[in-house]
Design a protein with these regions (language model features):
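Short catalytic/metal-binding and nucleic-acid-binding patches
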Residues: 1-324
Length: 324
């Protein structure tokens, strides 16, 4: 049948993509390789820095898919981001953005294999001001928590700061790696924007309040990391000397659960979101079985991704469940 040939004959766990959602997104390099290292970013060995590659690819697709960047840290072998999805198209954005970024990185380092380990990475839905502020701080503190530098400001790669929540825009020139140097295909310059979306400002009351909460979480994380590493950090120069063909050697636990949502201790909200997720998966399973049975007029639940965007099936309008 057509649905088997097109990859919709079976379902693991359907993912729901709702407009107006905050996400923590993590994207790891295959086999923990340092393919995103800022290695020689300021030298003349490469035409573009990894930061430029990230910013161009992100700006290229963010406006198209309604994505706003709130915080980001590009580590040597993974990317941490906090994003706001205005249209429910985060999956499409990540697939397109990550493909362009991976292609440019491969050309930059002459890599023969894949750059990333999964098609679009893992998403963690953030609900509530505490969860959002904590994850933004986590992103900014990542190089310190990894024992690489003593402060976020020392990280030589792409990393955002608390001040960026007030909004910042930079012009990014088109990289020379991989991309067609054609103005119609790839704009010679794009605007990379980062900052708090108006929805976040409404949640926190003001950007200043949001920045204060993030700064508080960030300070605690940095102090804890410095105690844990006893003040011993690799340092900026060792980070810059990292070979893009090398891999991380530190122990990392595999096989753990990947969180799908974070409410930072708000149990009532967590129960509501879990109930919504279960209801969505049940409705999705029913709709998918109807498609497999040959029915043509099938409506999928709100937040359906692939079956709506790729195959054109209609989906319901999202209506939140009442609070418990």
């Amino acid at each position: 049948r057509w649905h088997a040939a097109w990859g919709v004959a079976a379902m693991s766990k359907a993912k729901q993509y709702l407009p107006g959602t905050f996400y923590e997104v993590t994207r790891r390099c295959v086999e923990r390789a340092h393919k995103l290292t800022p290695n020689y970013a300021s030298s003349r060995k490469y035409a573009s820095s990894v930061e430029q590659l990230y910013k161009y690819a992100t700006a290229r697709y963010a406006a198209r898919y309604g994505i706003e960047v709130i915080a980001v840290c590009v580590m040597s072998n993974h990317i941490h981001e906090v994003l706001f999805d205005r249209t429910g198209k985060i999956s499409q954005f990540l697939q397109a953005r990550n493909k362009m970024l991976a292609d440019t990185v491969k050309v930059r380092y002459g890599l023969p294999s894949n750059v990333f380990d999964k098609p679009d990475g893992t998403y963690n839905r953030l609900e509530g001001t505490t969860a959002i502020a904590d994850k933004i701080a986590y992103v900014m503190a990542n190089p310190v928590e990894a024992g690489l530098v003593a402060s976020p400001e020392e990280w030589p790669g792409m990393i955002s700061a608390v001040e960026d929540l007030f909004g910042a825009t930079t012009n990014v020139a088109r990289p020379r790696e991989y991309l067609a140097q054609n103005n119609k295909t790839n704009a010679p310059t794009v605007k990379f924007r980062i900052g708090a979306p108006k929805e976040a400002v409404e949640l926190f009351g003001s950007v200043t309040e949001m920045a204060m909460q993030v700064a508080s979480h960030l300070s605690k994380k940095i102090k804890a990391a410095r105690r844990r590493h006893s003040g011993n950090f690799a340092g900026r120069q060792r980070v810059l000397a990292t070979n893009p063909h090398s891999r991380a050697k530190t122990y990392e636990k595999f096989g753990g659960r990947v969180p799908r949502l974070t409410t930072a201790g708000d149990l009532a909200t967590a129960k509501r979101l879990i109930a919504e997720m279960r209801a969505f998966r049940k409705a999705y399973r029913v709709a998918l079985e109807a498609v497999k049975a040959g029915k043509r007029r099938v409506t999928f639940p709100a937040g359906t991704g692939k079956m709506h965007f790729a195959y054109g099936y209609p989906r319901e309008v999202y209506v939140p469940l009442p609070a418990a």
